[in-house]
Each structure stands twice: as structure tokens, then as C-alpha cells.
């Protein structure tokens, strides 16, 4: 087992978690805003 490779993989995995969480959060915000606009359109009609 190559420990340097394993340590690099673990460091990359740990550092990629916040990035993926932030991107998922922004996607969720965009979708919820879109859904709210659709609901408002139906609410007026």
C-alpha cells in the first residue's frame, strides 16, 4: 500500500466535501427560487 497516495487521496476527499456541499446548497437555492416563482404564478391565476 502506498501511504503517500492514500494520504493524498484522503486529503483531496476531505477538501472536496465542503465544495460539493456548497454547490449542492446553491443548486437547492436556485431550484427553490424557481419553484416559488411557479407557485406564485399559479397562486395569482
UniProtKB/Swiss-Prot annotation:
Its main location: host cell. The chain crosses the membrane at residues 9-29. GO terms for cellular component: host cell Golgi apparatus; host cell mitochondrial outer membrane; host cell plasmodesma; membrane. It comes from the Viruses. Coiled coil: none annotated. It is found in: Host cell junction, Host plasmodesma; Host Golgi apparatus; Host chloroplast envelope; Host mitochondrion outer membrane. Keywords: Host cell junction, Host Golgi apparatus, Host membrane, Host mitochondrion, Host mitochondrion outer membrane, Membrane, Transmembrane, Transmembrane helix. Together with movement protein P17, plays an essential role in virus long distance movement. Belongs to the polerovirus movement protein P3a family. This is P3a.
Amino acid at each position: 500500500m502506498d501511504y503517500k497516495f492514500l494520504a493524498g487521496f484522503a486529503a483531496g476527499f476531505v477538501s472536496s466535501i465542503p465544495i460539493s456541499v456548497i454547490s449542492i446548497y446553491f443548486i437547492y437555492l436556485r431550484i427553490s427560487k424557481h419553484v416559488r416563482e411557479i407557485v406564485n404564478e399559479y397562486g395569482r391565476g
